[in-house]
Amino acid sequence: MDFEQYGQSSQQPRQRRRRAGKRRLNNKTPIAARLALDPQLRGKVGILSEDLANDLFQQQALQDVTTSDDGVLYVAIAPHTPTYTSVEDQAWTILPVRIQPTERSPVAMSHSTVLFPESADSLQPFLQALGKVDSSRNSLQAHRSVEIRILDVAPIHLDTIFVTVERHLLRNHDDVQTKFGGGFTNAQGPNGLWGKTGKSVEAKKYSKRAAADAEQRLTAAVREALGAQRIVHTGDVLPLPLPSHPITYAPPPPARISFCEPVSQGLLMSTTKIVLVQARPQGIRAQQTMPSRSALLKQVAEDEADDTSNEQFYSAAEDKPGESGTEMEVTSAAEESETEGSAGSMSDSSDDSLEDMISLSAPELPQPPSGVMSSLTSATPRAGGRRSDGIHTPGSVASNFTSATMRPGRGGGKTFKVEGLLQQVPNEVLHPRPRDDEDVDSFVFVDISTLAKIGCFSGDWVRIEAAEEPQLNMFASLKFGSFNDSPEDSGDWRPVKIFGLSGLPSSKPRYAINHSGERRPSISQRPPTRLTPSVFVPPLLLGNIENPKYLRISPMTFATPNGSSKPGILQHMKNTAAKNPPLAKEVTLLKVSTPLSMDRVLQPALFAGLKQYFESRRRILKSGDLVGISVDEGLGRAVFSGTGSGDSASQEEDITIRLGQGANATNAGTRKIGVAWFRVGQVAPTTVEELEETGEDQWGGVAVLDPATTRMVQAGSDVSRVPGVLGNGWEYWLGVKTIPKTVHDAPTPHGIVADPPQSVIPPLQQRIRDLMSAATSPRAIQLGMKPVFILLRSQQRHIGKATVATRACSDIGIHTFPIDAYDILTEGGANGGDVKTEAYLKARAERAFHCGANCTALLIRHIEVLTADRIVTAMSDILNDARVVIATTTDVETIPEGIRSLITHEFEMGAPEEKEREGILQNAVTERGIRLSADVDLGSIALKTAALVAGDLVDVVERAAGARTARLESLAEASKKISGSEVFVRDVLLAGGDGARGVTKADFDAAVEAARKNFADSIGAPKIPNVGWDDVGGLTNVKDALVETIQLPLERPELFAKGMKKRSGILFYGPPGTGKTLLAKAIATEFSLNFFSVKGPELLNMYIGESEANVRRVFQRARDARPCVVFFDELDSVAPKRGNQGDSGGVMDRIVSQLLAELDGMNGGEENSGGVFVIGATNRPDLLDTALLRPGRFDKMLYLGVSDTHRKQATILEALTRKFALHPDVSLDRVAEQLPLTYTGADLYALCSDAMLKAITRKATAVDEKINALPNGPVSTAWFFDHLATKEDVNVMVTEEDFLSAQGELVPSVSAKELEHFERIRQTFEAVDKSKQDPAAAAPQTIAEAMEAFSLGGSAIPEEAPTINGDSLTPGGIHGRIKGLNRWPGNPVRSTSGQSTTSSKGKGKSVSKKGKSRTGAESDGSVDGDDEDMADANSKEDEDEDDYVVRTDHLRNPMEEVE
């Protein structure tokens, strides 16, 4: 390195790296400095001036650097922007620097300067950031400095970096070196390597060994390139140390750093992982080589379309056939006509720019004029333009603009589309720069290219007035004769100062070339393009002119005393420069009555803010204007809660004013900011001589308020609405809300932020807004329409009822006066009961109506607690004076009937759906100004937050922001441990990256998990158990059936959207311990469903009606938590057969009836019926009410039995021992071979648990023996494990002997006889069709056919009937019964009552011992386990689940009589 010019010798000992301790300051603000390039410097380290070093680093740190090895410090620089607010808003670049040597420096550096070598490539990220801030400054030149902001920084160590290189880079490089290494020779021919045929020499093929060697060389080259970098930045282009082209000397394609973790820039360590990615080159210039390193900082971004190769250089007329049309960007005569300027306007000459004279269309012969097109000439505006009627084009057929109609000195102006500003534009970017005390609310901003079309200069006074939307149709505004006279000035205009800014987005026409050469048949087929430029207006000014969509801007003209105007641009410049609005002698202000401005506690803060507002700037106001004052409500209530006097009161006012004025900064979202509104009543100007002489007001009634001379009077209050937030961003302008920003947002050179965030508006909010707009409209008030009383009800708290109502009022500018019924009840109950409660309620309502009954909505929260009889009368009186009353409740049943009768509209707010949850999350993120990284998908987060309401979703967002802060702090602590220097969170933010700047997906996942864990009990959010298919051993056929039943409605909901029924009820039955509950949990986990587990006793309640209400609440919670699984364990205790219980009140029967009613709606095709799956588990399905088993309820019955093979038992053992440390000699197959086939899943679980317990006991015994055998005597077990225990003493391994020993002690939970009983129950409920029926011998399918068969003595079951569990459905093979009619005698059947019945004489008479038979559904009772010849089944099911066999066993023979 050559530092001799600045006094640093090459023999000077290198200084070691700085070790910063606690002396670093965490809250240091950036310092303004200048960055310059020096061609005489070498290396990649810059030089820092001495004054900057003293300002950035502490003295002790500088002393440590002087004795270090290399003396390298690290700073972060960013382009200077006037809109700086925080470190996160800038794109910082970390660079290595050294301090300027002072001993032998012949040339002194400039003050606050950073010098960098011209050949340094570490400035690439800074150049990119500089190009985004100012597109004209995307490169640096030597000895020309740029303004920057600089901070000291401690670099973060990188964990992983991804380096992208071109695919087959070394292979192509070797081929080039082989072909051109010796240059062009005669032996190769005159065409080089290409002969006369034009074919190149074939490249040699690479073997696998050559490819491996090439990969090693490439890895070494990348490592060498990275080793030369002190700081690695994402996006850096690294030149690879490979030979250049032998002939062109072009360097090989470089490597690019595509991604870094955990931050976007930092230090390389020995532990940093380097991931090499080989990608194909993209784009037209993908094969272009990297420019030389010396010219890297001088390059300018080139357009890819500017390629002048032979293949692409052709004119528009020579376009190749078959290609798509090329769009060209030209300026046409239509843009000239849009200026609407007259012949006397001095801005016409500026429109004749060179752009309008260039045409890129192919030369063609002119078409003969005919039809409509014959009327269009060169003077007619282009069709599709903004003003295409030709009125202002002299010579056109539609123009009446002639020399006789021209008015000198007055131009037509130009129409602009209005864009509202969200924050103030700094004065530093304006030219000419306005004074600091000028009113920023009277500034408008346009693109600098449109100033000439208006006819003014930047900083001039212009007049603005509302205009209509320009018509796209050229004949839309066509009029004839005298009807086309231009209207006179309406007088509703106001003067503003206009400033031109560069870099604003401008719309220009783009026309496609007509390649076909055919003539367009009509003008209407031309695509309409809107070319209206934009004007950026402050939101308060926009609200004072009634929020127009378009504005007409024209230059100000000043009349002389004799009434004639003075044309001429020079005179216009003199008048504009000399004229200013008149000063106001006296201004009257009216306080707009709002709940905030009427609060007595906030009055001192309100007037202190008003004083600060008018003293800080010379405000320009007009009679009727609205003025907004920001007030910090929290600080105002805290500071002015008591009475202050003297100096302390003035200090409190200063605190309130300054914090209120700073509300539009980044901390606006952390404080509650309110706005108080004042209306300008009367403005009296100081001088009226000019107005008397000219007879007109040349300034539109505006005047300047000078705080030194103007007398201000606050006279009374005004009742009116405030500006609505729809289409107006005054909340961001006044600091009520924070402007949302993304991770990759970069500051703009003009500082304009005009894109309002798109908030998601729920349909209920729109409905309430429409109702309030209609109720408060002047027409409704004039006609005396009844007021609107809206009730918002929900079953859960914090669902957002009051928030929706408040936002609906804010949308249309209506005041919201909240009243908490609990406060009313508390104050009234403490002072006299219902009478006082009524008086407090009326007093609060009367206070709200002071703000205007026609523009105030009364919001009563928790109205269900106002149950007194006197409240009904009070509410009726309140409604007589109000226009809008909104009440919220979570228990609508407790609201008195008198109040319910007054309600006109009632809306229910349920738990938000997935799309609604996504909208709530989006609004919460936007309002808090939280940056989201690219990997965050709010839709997936909404999917994981089922059953959470609006309050919980907002808490999730806040928890995610807190998780980001904790993550950054932990990253700083980890970097501190690695480097040994002090690292702050600010250093992580300076390093940048998505993870540092924004909230990541991992932060949201942690927030969702924490929210579910902390709020599950309070809000009833169901928990998803962590059980998967791997935890369920065996049951493969059951898993397949579940996937078919549940997965199809979840993945293809559109199939069921139009009424198609789906099977959402599943019943698991079988012996106890076979995994029914475990399988239900696995369903919820595998399909990402929420999980409810309902036990029978939870539904019972001693009060009448409450048990059924509990059933309704369970299913309502399940619908709110969709997609959800409701699991009824031991269903036979919840829904037994009706009529068999002995309870006097019939509670169980009512529970069953309510359960049946709820299950009917679960599988419907309605909009809100899907997404809930009901699963029941029982050991005794024969005890269930038969109505539960019909299709549409529990229509899918799955039997879960014991394993019938040892291989299935081994599969279950493998699932149970997944987390066990098994001995290598253990074979689970051998263990399973020794087990009986009567073991259930629970028995196998007990076997594994006992085996593990025996292994632990054996290990504990061995440790005790080892302790007792110690030479120095026994020690405590804890001391042994802390000091003497080895790895073998801690690890517990289960051996095969442990399993065998556990098996010897294990008693099966289900005996073989009980398993036979469950198998018979299974045969009762299941039937398998093993053979297809012959259509000719099919069983009777109608009731009439069955009755005829029975009456004729025939068989209702054919010979080739389907088999039931192996038994043929023949008189000799089935022991069944047909309810009330038994065809085969001698088969005892036990009835529901437990009595045995027999058939007599083969005629189907069913005789009971009690003299009565049980028929109908009750005859499907439980079967006796002791009867060997029991009836097997009453229901038959084919192999195809969709083919149903008609059951006729419930029919009776009408010819028989029951005895």
Swiss-Prot record:
Pfam family, one: AAA
UniProt feature, compositional bias: Polar residues: 396-405
Composition bias, Acidic residues: 1421-1443
Membrane topology (UniProt): Peripheral membrane protein
Source organism of this protein record: Penicillium chrysogenum (Penicillium notatum)
GO molecular function terms noted in the UniProt entry: ATP binding; ATP hydrolysis activity
Taxonomy, superkingdom: Eukaryota
Catalysed reactions, semicolon-separated: ATP + H2O = ADP + phosphate + H(+)
Binding-site positions, ATP: 1070-1077
One cellular-component annotation, GO: peroxisomal membrane
First-listed, main subcellular location of the protein, grouped into a coarse class: cytoplasm
Protein name per Swiss-Prot or TrEMBL: Peroxisomal ATPase PEX6
EC number(s) on file: 3.6.4.-
Basic and acidic residues bias spans: 1444-1459
Subunit note: Interacts with PEX1; forming the PEX1-PEX6 AAA ATPase complex, which is composed of a heterohexamer formed by a trimer of PEX1-PEX6 dimers.
Entry keyword annotation includes Hydrolase: yes
Biased composition (Basic residues): 14-26, 1402-1413
